[in-house]
């Protein structure tokens, strides 16, 4: 419905990370992760592995390779090295921009709040540039300085949110049927899409998206109900003929009227690994 509900509290000390459900939540809703969390208000310690010291359901909200690259860029510009960060720092950075229904507050002061309309071609080309630079050891001091335009696009990519995987991608919002212009924030009636860009440094180069599209066609034939998808024409300078776009299954476009505020809803998402 888009209504925000307090699920509980995450806390960290020298012993590790702990979670406690809010009593009001348990009286109304089910367990977020029934295999690893108990449906009680007792404090529950997270295992050290395999989810960076947090419970699996929250580990699902952490960024993967591409999201980590973007976060690390931002933190380095603030003088913070990746080895100084904890999973809790990264969850605070994700805030309400991750996949699924969970959000985290307070939000990190370093988290991007850019609300911008941006050309999809520009976003994809700059994402490709950032990804390719990471392949040539971007951590070298000589590679950390970005020009103003690339800096703006980096902020837009980060503002778009966090998602799994190592490939360059962006979470964007756009009206149904309009792919040429997109934005990093939702407007009423927008659809949420995940756009997967390409790079010469990927295993299948600029054909990664085309290959995945074939797999999606196969899953449709097999009646596996894949998410809605489309191929979007890529600019010639990208080296790709098309980029793959996947409609986010966790984002409910239908809106509920919450007093004076209308809000899109989210579906809870939990991976098999996180379980």
Predicted regions and their residues:
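Phosphate/dinucleotide-binding and metal-coordinating scaffold of catalytic cores
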Residues: 1-275
């Amino acid at each position: 419905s888009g209504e925000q509900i307090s699920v509980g509290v995450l806390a960290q000390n020298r012993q590790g990370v702990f979670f406690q459900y809010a009593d009001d939540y348990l009286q109304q809703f089910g367990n977020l992760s029934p295999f690893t969390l108990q449906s009680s208000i007792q404090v529950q310690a997270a295992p050290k592995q395999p989810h960076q010291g947090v419970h699996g359901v929250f580990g699902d909200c952490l960024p993967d390779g591409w999201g980590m690259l973007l976060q690390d860029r931002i933190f380095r510009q603030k003088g913070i090295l990746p080895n100084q960060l904890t999973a809790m720092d990264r969850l605070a950075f994700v805030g309400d921009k991750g996949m699924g229904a969970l959000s985290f507050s307070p939000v990190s002061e370093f988290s991007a709040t850019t609300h911008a309309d941006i050309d999809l071609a520009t976003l994809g080309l700059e994402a490709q540039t950032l990804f390719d630079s990471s392949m040539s050891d971007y951590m070298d001091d000589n590679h950390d300085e970005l020009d103003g335009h690339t800096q703006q696009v980096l902020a837009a990519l980060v503002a778009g949110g966090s998602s799994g995987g190592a490939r360059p991608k962006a979470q964007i919002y756009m009206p149904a049927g309009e792919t040429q212009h997109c934005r990093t924030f939702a407007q009423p009636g927008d659809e949420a899409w995940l756009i997967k860009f390409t790079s010469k440094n990927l295993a299948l180069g600029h054909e990664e998206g085309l290959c995945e599209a074939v797999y999606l066609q196969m899953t449709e034939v097999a009646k596996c109900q894949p998410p809605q998808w489309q191929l979007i024409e890529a600019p010639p300078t990208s080296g790709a003929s098309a980029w793959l776009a996947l409609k986010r299954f966790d984002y409910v476009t239908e809106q509920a009227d919450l007093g004076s505020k209308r809000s899109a809803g989210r579906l809870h998402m939990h991976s098999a690994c996180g379980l």
